[in-house]
Amino acid sequence: MSFRAPNLIRSTVGRRAGQTLNLRSQVIRRRFATEGGPEITKPSAPRSSNTGYIFAGLGVAAVGAAYYFYGTGRTEHDSTNKADTVVREAVATVEAKTGLRRGKDEYQKVYNRIAETLDKEGYDDGSLAPVLLRLAWHASGTYSKADGTGGSNFATMRFKPEAEHSANNGLHVAREHMEKIKQEFPWISYGDLWTLGGVCAIQESGGPTIPWRPGRIDGYAAQVTPDGRLPDATQAQDHLRFIFNRMGFNDQEIVALSGAHAMGRCHPNRSGFDGPWTFSPVTFSNQYFALLRDEPWQWKKWTGPAQFEDKKTKTLMMLPTDMALVKDKSFKKYVDIYADNEEKFFSDFAKAFSKLIELGVPERQWAGEPWTMATSD
């Protein structure tokens, strides 16, 4: 991070940087009651051989934090949050550059623990995998490439405004479940935890291997994005392009990511819609595309929002946004490819989903190339 420090900062940077670091330590120890965030566990002491790197990184962060705190006219509360975000970003960057971040084996333990908890008797079709996949998707799909806001970096669905966005109805189930995992591994950020949960859900349900890496940090309620950034299921192809192009996805990636509907079902008390997309809603496959293309569909006669049902069994459903994929010529060609070739779908989905869950995370926060997490079997 670079900026032109005002004269006040130049003359007092040492003293106020120290004050800011002290402020940081106080912030870490308290619970963010006004933000609704969790208590942050004090990190373990760094290895002595890298202490100089850490202090150097935190010194840069302290100067940046001091600038925001003293030089922008913000309220103390806003400045404290902004300063703490700057420090967290700096710490993540230092960890990435000095090799201090926990290794793959530590994150594999988190993955394994999530995998152990996926089966849940009495919940939907007996698995939490679909709702964990949805959590990872929705936590990442708020990104805007125009201003760099949104995405998985700050895990802002922890806060009431975003949690209550209509598109996130029902995701409290996933967040509450993942909170139990967080208690076992308090060092992992929520953004890393939720996206790793999505990767686990896909892989453990027979889907492709998804490249994943840690580096996301937790943010504040002020970083919540506006409502309306996630797809509206009642809309058509123009809406899909508007939503996905904002994140930087093309037509092929839009169709590939829509394949996540291979898993799960809709609920009248959440989205208003009802039913699964496929006959195997806890298995990740290309069945969604085959059914979408090959089955005859009709409007469902009911009192709920407009949706489609299959003519044969009337047990499956498709949303207006799903049907848009076969009505649009550009989208349809990818539906055909994926319906006929599951291997191609898996390959394209893995690339698109890995891209999705990294949206909004500064490149400097990554420690290296993505990992391949081993499945439980």
Curated annotation (Swiss-Prot):
It comes from the Eukaryota. Disulfide bonds: none annotated. Keywords: Heme, Iron, Metal-binding, Mitochondrion, Oxidoreductase, Peroxidase, Transit peptide. Residues 1-32 form a transit peptide. GO terms for cellular component: mitochondrial intermembrane space; mitochondrial matrix. It is found in: Mitochondrion matrix; Mitochondrion intermembrane space. Its main location: mitochondrion. SUPFAM superfamilies: Heme-dependent peroxidases. The keyword Transit peptide applies. It catalyses: 2 Fe(II)-[cytochrome c] + H2O2 + 2 H(+) = 2 Fe(III)-[cytochrome c] + 2 H2O. Heme b binds at residue 261. GO terms for molecular function: cytochrome-c peroxidase activity; heme binding; metal ion binding. The active site is at 138 (proton acceptor), 277 (tryptophan radical intermediate). GO terms for biological process: cellular response to oxidative stress; hydrogen peroxide catabolic process; response to reactive oxygen species. Its cofactor is heme b. Gene3D superfamilies: 1.10.520.10, Peroxidase, domain 2 (1.10.420.10). The record marks 134 as: Transition state stabilizer. Belongs to the peroxidase family. Cytochrome c peroxidase subfamily. PANTHER family: CYTOCHROME C PEROXIDASE, MITOCHONDRIAL (PTHR31356:SF58), THYLAKOID LUMENAL 29 KDA PROTEIN, CHLOROPLASTIC-RELATED (PTHR31356). Forms a one-to-one complex with cytochrome c. Interacts with MID1 (via C-terminus); the interaction may contribute to cellular detoxification of radicals. Destroys radicals which are normally produced within the cells and which are toxic to biological systems. This is Cytochrome c peroxidase, mitochondrial. It comes from Cryptococcus neoformans var. grubii serotype A (strain H99 / ATCC 208821 / CBS 10515 / FGSC 9487). The lineage of its organism: Eukaryota, Fungi, Dikarya, Basidiomycota, Agaricomycotina. The gene is CCP1.
